[in-house]
Amino acid sequence: MEYKILQPERRGSLLLVTINRPESMNALNTAFFDEMDHLIANDAADPGLTAIIITGAGKAFIAGADIAEMVNKTPAEAEAFSIRGQATFRSISTTAVPVIAAINGFALGGGLELALACDFRIASNNAKFGQPEVNLGLIPGYAGTQRLPRLIGMGDALYMLTTGEMLTAADALRIGLVQKVTEPEQLMEEVLRIAGVIASKGPDAVKLVKFVTRQGYQVSLAQGSQLEAQSFSQLFGKQGTEGMKAFLEKRKPQW
């Protein structure tokens, strides 16, 4: 596929994906979902990857879904549009390696929902966050009502969802919506640093710990603990054994 909206760039074992529709503040449309589906199924499936970074070009991460594309949809078409977006974002969250949202500027509506589908979020201090759908007489359609309370708690989530108010980066950090805040000019440097730290760890362990943590969050503690024990054991005789030997021998592991 020839990408027109996404700009994927391989940097060693990292994949940097820039959403490049700055003239529309990177608003999400059908073409975006087509390209992201292809990227996740192909570029992001490379076993040599250690992390994926998603960011936006220009003044916004993503300012929301493309309202001009949605306005004339029938209820049936709107449901299909919602289901399609949910599937794409689910594929992002279930990608084998960690996915980091580098949030510059506005992350609103569908843009915040995409950020929620990532494993964690790093923001510049001029970023703004919100689920403003109620201002248009709508609700989120890409699982925002489900992921947001799971991440920040029911009270803060319902406040954002029912008021449509925007949060500053400082507020987002306070409630756990983002993990770090930087100066705008330092955002990508910090995200690349974090991705580099991840790349230095045992790659099989990183993939497994993401899988077990996400899967375990959806089942009982007993079921999640069983999954953890099974996954823990898979690393013995492989990279886990190499890592422990390297520690004892005071050398760097050879993954």
Residue spans for each PLM region:
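Terminal peptide-recognition signature
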Residues: V17, R21, M36, I54, ...
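A general structural signal for well-ordered alpha-helical segments in protein cores
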Residues: G12, F33, G64-I67, G85, ...
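Glycine- (often His-adjacent) and acidic-residue-rich active-site loop
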Residues: A45-G48, G56-S91, A107, V219-S220, ...
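Phosphate-coordinating loops and pocket residues in cytosolic domains that bind phosphorylated ligands
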Residues: A27-T30, A63, N72, T162, ...
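Conserved CoA-thioester-binding segment of acyl-CoA-metabolizing enzymes
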Residues: M1-A57, R90
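Hydrophobic alpha-helical membrane-association signature
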Residues: F32-E35, F81-R84, L114, L187, ...
